[in-house]
C-alpha cells in the first residue's frame, strides 16, 4: 500500500510539473495595462493596447496589421512586444492592433483599408503620445528589399540618425530615400511621413517572408533593444 501511495504522489507531482510547463508562459506574459478601441468600422478595427509599466521611462509605439496579408509581421511581433516588456520593466509598448475585416486577402483593397484605418485612427493618437519612436511593421517577398531592414520615408534627421546606428551595429539593413525619386508608397504618404512630421522618429520595419514565426518574434526583440538604446531618452 505504501508503495502505491508513493507512486500516486509521484504521478501527481509529474502532472503538476507538466501543467506548470504549459500554464507558466501564459501566467508570465504581461497583459495589457490599458486597452481602448479607437475605431470599429465596416472595413476593420483598431485597438490600442499598452503593454508594460505605465510609468516606464522608455516608450515604443508599434503598429501592426496595416497590410493584412503580411501575417508574419503581425501576431509574432505582438508576441515579441508582450514578452519584451515582461523582461524589461523600464519599457512600455503602445501597440496599435489593426485588423482589416473587409477584403483582407485582396492585395489592393486590403492594403487600402489597412492604411486608411491607420490614417483615420492611429496617426493623431500616436502623434499626441509619449512614444520615443514608432515602428510600422511589414513583411516582404524575396525580391522586395533584402533581409531585415528599416526605412525612413520622411528622411527626418532623427529617424535617419537612428537608422544609421542600427545599420552600423547590427545585421539589420537600412534603406533610406535617396532624394532622387518621388516616393509613391501610399502607406508612406498616409502614415509614416505624417507620423514622423509630428516629431516622432518613425521606422518602416520590413522582415522577409521566408522565415519562421520564431525568427520574427526574436528579431523584433532585437529591434526593440536597439530602439531603447538609440531612440529612447
State the predicted function of each range.
Residues 2-233:
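Structured catalytic-domain cores with a bias toward divalent-metal coordination
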Amino acid at each position: 500500500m505504501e508503495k502505491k501511495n508513493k507512486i500516486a504522489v509521484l504521478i501527481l507531482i509529474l502532472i503538476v510539473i507538466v501543467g506548470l510547463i504549459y500554464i507558466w508562459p501564459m501566467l508570465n506574459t504581461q497583459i495589457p495595462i490599458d486597452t481602448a478601441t479607437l475605431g470599429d468600422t465596416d472595413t476593420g478595427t483598431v485597438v490600442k493596447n499598452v503593454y508594460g509599466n505605465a510609468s516606464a521611462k522608455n516608450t515604443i509605439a508599434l503598429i501592426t496589421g496595416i497590410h493584412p496579408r503580411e501575417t508574419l509581421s503581425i501576431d509574432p511581433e505582438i508576441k515579441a512586444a508582450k514578452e519584451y516588456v515582461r523582461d524589461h520593466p523600464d519599457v512600455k509598448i503602445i501597440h496599435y492592433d489593426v485588423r482589416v475585416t473587409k477584403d483582407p486577402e485582396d492585395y489592393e483593397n486590403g492594403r487600402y483599408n489597412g492604411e486608411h484605418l491607420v490614417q483615420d485612427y492611429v496617426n493623431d493618437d500616436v502623434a499626441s503620445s509619449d512614444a520615443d519612436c514608432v515602428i510600422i511593421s511589414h513583411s516582404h517577398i524575396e525580391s522586395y528589399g533584402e533581409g531585415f531592414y528599416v526605412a525612413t520615408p520622411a528622411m527626418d534627421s532623427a529617424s535617419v540618425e537612428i537608422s544609421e546606428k542600427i545599420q552600423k551595429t547590427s545585421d539589420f539593413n537600412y534603406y533610406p530615400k535617396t532624394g532622387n525619386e518621388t516616393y509613391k508608397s501610399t502607406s508612406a504618404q498616409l502614415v509614416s511621413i505624417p507620423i514622423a512630421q509630428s516629431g516622432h522618429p518613425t521606422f518602416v520595419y520590413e522582415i522577409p517572408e521566408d522565415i519562421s514565426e520564431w525568427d520574427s518574434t526574436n528579431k523584433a526583440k532585437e529591434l526593440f533593444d536597439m530602439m531603447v538604446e538609440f531612440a529612447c531618452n
